[in-house]
Amino acid sequence: MSHEEDLIDYSDEELQTTDAAATTAAPAANGDAAKKGDLTVSGGRPDKKGSYVGIHSTGFRDFLLKGELLRAITDCGFEHPSEVQQVCIPTAILNVDVLCQAKSGLGKTAVFVLTTLHQLEPVPGECSVLVMCHTRELAYQIKNEYARFSKYLPDVKTAVFYGGTPIQKDVEVLSNKESYPNIVVGTPGRLNALVRDKKLSLRNVKAFVLDECDKMLDQIDMRRDVQEIFRATPADKQVMMFSATLSQEIRPVCKKFMRNPLEVYVDDDTKLTLHGLQQYYIKLSEAEKNRKLNELLDSLEFNQVIIFVKSTLRANELDKLLRECNFPSIAVHSGVSQEERIKRYKEFKEFNKRICVATDVFGRGIDIERINLAINYDLPADADSYLHRVGRAGRFGTKGLSISFVSNEEDEKVLKDIEKRFEVALPEYPEGGVDSSTYMA
């Protein structure tokens, strides 16, 4: 399977459970922080404590990453770095320690994956990058991210080690110089066992990464494992830590592992994601949806539109109806064969089609810069899914418009949950429509 396939090879059900709750973080501990949009940024310069030097990047090329990484990024469909990536990557690739708080969906995994791959000069039989996290599922996911971004770096070997599987299999991987990983991802308990038994050597580690660091450093047993592993690595290395939440109490604990880190705290991830997005709802009956959708597509200016429905069957039916009404559309959902789904994804991304009907397969992880209109034909089941859906039309602060159809009591409940979660009062769509300058770049 290609990595492009991997990008959109999700079932609809898998995408219903994602945590996008808002967080509020206090200013950086050293008191000398710079505010950048919804971020608090401080430190990161070895010669001048408390200063911040950054660049505003419109594309990943501005980071001067390896050409092989840029090719992989393009293949994955990512066109612009998120604000967290803009702040962290330029400093991180200079070997500066990083402490970053950012919720899932803001691209923090890509920060350390791209940084470590850019810096890595793989030596056969040597582990140079060590990444730890608190669950097997997250470890496996991170390993897949390394595979995705290292597709044009054939000499880079990555392995994942975690409990619940026979340790002998891990030992076999580490006993063979051909399979010995340059990048190791795993959970603290299993990694500590491999280090203690002298199966895994960390004497050449140049980057030490903790994802969801507060989860590991809060628990005494896990913290002990992390500390023992840390002591097995060289003193001169880069340390990067990331988490969804970083309390005032845990930050000093994290910084004990670091030297004057760049500190990045997202004040409110929901504001960051939805900034620049005009959001409205329309109350109507189920029977009125098709007529209203036709009216909107006729009257609104847009570059590309994505229309979300709740099932593959409804996606096919709506796609057929739109084409019958002379709106050339495509449907993307888990019921479409993998080969056909890739073909349709490319058609949409390359602007050969302007209208896409989708389930939550397209609800997250797809960054297509021309989408500036998102319509919830069927409102999602929860506020988290809403955030990921409408974020397609307001990626990383660009302008966009979202319109949600509210047709029953359950929809009204979800609408109230959305307003409560994101601390906004969504207005009803005005009868006279909206000014295109408010959502067209």
Curated annotation (Swiss-Prot):
A motif (Q motif) lies at residues 58-86. GO terms for biological process: mRNA 3'-end processing; mRNA export from nucleus; mRNA splicing, via spliceosome; subtelomeric heterochromatin formation; transcription elongation by RNA polymerase II; transcription-coupled nucleotide-excision repair. It is found in: Nucleus. A motif (DECD box) lies at residues 211-214. One of its GO terms (cellular component) is spliceosomal complex. CDD domains: DEADc_DDX39, SF2_C_DEAD. The keyword RNA-binding applies. ATP binds at A102, K103, S104, G105, L106, G107, K108, T109. InterPro entries: DEAD/DEAH_box_helicase_dom, Helicase_ATP-bd, Helicase_C-like, P-loop_NTPase, RNA_helicase_DEAD_Q_motif. One of its GO terms (molecular function) is RNA binding. Residues 292-437 form the Helicase C-terminal domain. Its EC number is 3.6.4.13. It catalyses: ATP + H2O = ADP + phosphate + H(+). Residues 23-32 have a biased composition (Low complexity). Keywords: ATP-binding, Helicase, Hydrolase, mRNA processing, mRNA splicing, mRNA transport, Nucleotide-binding, Nucleus, RNA-binding, Spliceosome, Transport. Residues 89-264 form the Helicase ATP-binding domain. Residues 23-42 are annotated as: Disordered. It is an enzyme of class 3 (hydrolase). Pfam families: DEAD (PF00270), Helicase_C (PF00271). It comes from the Eukaryota. PANTHER family: ATP-DEPENDENT RNA HELICASE DBP3 (PTHR47958). Belongs to the DEAD box helicase family. DECD subfamily. The Q motif is unique to and characteristic of the DEAD box family of RNA helicases and controls ATP binding and hydrolysis. ATP-binding RNA helicase involved in transcription elongation and required for the export of mRNA out of the nucleus. SUB2 also plays a role in pre-mRNA splicing and spliceosome assembly. May be involved in rDNA and telomeric silencing, and maintenance of genome integrity. This is ATP-dependent RNA helicase sub2. The gene is sub2.
